[in-house]
């Protein structure tokens, strides 16, 4: 029973942190004092569940990684057409971002500016993993469909992911007014026409 309460409290702390990142407070540095107040516990109680604020952010990063990478793997298992795979992966990231604005502050690096460098490295590693997946999808086109792209797969993957990162940054910069999926179909039509 105590383990379940501890697990629930950990989740409650992470949810409160994500909510704070989504609010106007997320535009500035979040302190453990503010977070403890939001959760309704003492600052010491936070540290019973997490040894540091960096570990709290790591908990959210782990959630982001698991959510995105597991869904990307599902896309790769279920879809075989290269362009459709790419479209679904890009759309997945944008939809995830739109549904989780507070977590988008982490993905964009905005929430991590004044935090431990290790956290920024984790986000960079996540984007490198996604870019590697995109490169692999692009390379497999030659094997699956007998077609290649007019541009090197490495350059193309970086460009595709860069477009997504730009949408995430715009979403954060606008205080979540410009939805990442807004005009996605037109955006995809433009991109896919260039890489067919």
UniProtKB/Swiss-Prot annotation:
Tagged with keyword Cell division: yes
Main location: cytoplasm
InterPro entries registered for this protein in UniProt: Homeodomain-like_sf, HTH-type_TetR-like_transc_reg, HTH_TetR, NO_SlmA, SlmA-like_C, Tet_transcr_reg_TetR-rel_C_sf
Keywords of this entry: Cell cycle, Cell division, Coiled coil, Cytoplasm, DNA-binding
Residues in coiled coil: 65-142
Location(s), subcellular: Cytoplasm, Nucleoid
Limits of the HTH tetR-type domain: 7-68
GO MF, one annotated term: transcription cis-regulatory region binding
DNA-binding region residue numbers: 31-50
GO cellular component: bacterial nucleoid; cytoplasm
Domain of life: Bacteria
A Gene Ontology biological process term: negative regulation of division septum assembly
Subunit structure: Homodimer. Interacts with FtsZ.
Protein family per UniProt: Belongs to the nucleoid occlusion factor SlmA family.
Function per UniProt: Required for nucleoid occlusion (NO) phenomenon, which prevents Z-ring formation and cell division over the nucleoid. Acts as a DNA-associated cell division inhibitor that binds simultaneously chromosomal DNA and FtsZ, and disrupts the assembly of FtsZ polymers. SlmA-DNA-binding sequences (SBS) are dispersed on non-Ter regions of the chromosome, preventing FtsZ polymerization at these regions.
UniProt protein name: Nucleoid occlusion factor SlmA
Gene assigned in the entry: slmA
